[in-house]
Regions:
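Conserved catalytic-core motifs of GNAT/GCN5-like acyltransferases
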Residues: 73, 132, 145-165
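Conserved GNAT acetyl-CoA-binding A-motif
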Residues: 114, 121-133
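Conserved acetyl-CoA-binding loop-helix of GNAT-fold acetyltransferases
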Residues: 100, 106-119, 142, 146
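Conserved acyl-donor/pantetheine-binding loop and adjacent beta-alpha core of acyl/acetyltransferases
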Residues: 69-97, 105, 158-161
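Conserved beta-hairpin
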Residues: 51-68
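Conserved GNAT-fold acetyl-CoA-binding loop/helix
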Residues: 14, 21-43
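A short beta-loop-alpha structural element at the N-terminal edge
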Residues: 1-15
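Conserved active-site alpha-helix within GNAT-family acetyltransferase domains
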Residues: 111, 123, 136-153
Length: 174
């Protein structure tokens, strides 16, 4: 099940962030561009929760297996990217920090999260879904076209002001 997060989910969301960073360290594949202690953190989860835009994927027993931030905020670098689907800011939904616990990878959960985000955005009157992902994030860059997203270009950014991170942009008409 995917639902809006509860405050009691926050430690589990932060634990998924850490599990992803641990997995990257263990495999040597640092595909997210994240930096431990800087982004994402428990404070990141709390801030997204406080904004009312944190969603979680949970098992029947309440175990959190993933999360995402779904809002309409585009990074300044991304806002003027190579978008081909015209839309006013109020018509755009954006997925940020979509996470799946590494132990649950390959089960179609990211697809479920994106489908949920699309349905939620449509119910809010949004007409376009956009998101960015690091150019080195092979999983996200492979999944995006497979679920109907169009590559809209690459932008250069210093993500969270700490790391050079070129981002691939994706969009889909809802």
């Amino acid at each position: 099940m995917i639902r809006i997060a509860k405050e009691s989910d926050l430690p589990a969301v932060a634990a998924v962030y850490e599990a992803i960073l641990d997995h990257e360290d263990a495999t040597g594949l640092h595909y997210t561009g994240w930096k431990r202690g800087a982004y994402p953190t428990a404070d990141t989860a709390r801030n997204i929760f406080n904004a009312g835009t944190l969603y979680v994927g949970v098992d029947e027993d309440g175990t959190v297996w993933g999360s995402m931030n779904l809002n309409g905020i585009q990074l300044p670098e991304c806002k003027n990217g190579g978008w081909s689907i015209p839309a006013e800011d109020s018509q755009v939904a954006v997925i940020h920090t979509l996470t799946i616990h590494p132990d649950r990878a390959g089960q179609g959960l990211a697809r479920q999260m994106v489908a949920f985000a699309e349905d939620t955005a449509r119910s809010q009157g949004k007409t376009v879904m956009r998101f960015d992902t690091g150019v080195s994030n092979a999983v996200s860059n492979h999944l995006s076209p497979a679920i109907g997203y169009r590559f809209a270009g690459t932008v250069d950014t210093f993500f969270m002001g700490y790391v050079h991170c070129p981002l691939n942009l994706y969009e889909k008409k809802l």
